């Protein structure tokens, strides 16, 4: 499938783009937004979920240089809960993302869980959207671009790779390393 013209669900975290975010929403869509943003007049039939990102972050002892990143993890918990993603699935996903770094995985999950628990106690679901786990399909491969590129490189004969480890290509190379380890 290709890019669709309008979105069913949007997460708005940026004042500069919030109008465009709303413009891309379909009627009947859902807007999650950081409640410190000033929303423009909304003329669509959409469901709006404010997220108290800044207020919740004040309850967390986090390094200042990590605040923006952790705010994103916070909304993962809020949106995940409202969309019906089980908490253990979020935990497993974070553990996988930060495999080999258990302290980082735990600190990220603690922030996700804060958002999850907030939504569980404070947000009444009003929309029709849910994310469900699909049954396992043993005849198909489901992957992302980095993993697909890594596998293609390896099966294509890659024998040597050099890169600077903070470039955007790092994820692709780390995927290749994971495949040969």
Model-derived segments and their meaning:
Residues 1-156, 160-162:
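Active-site cofactor/cluster-binding pocket
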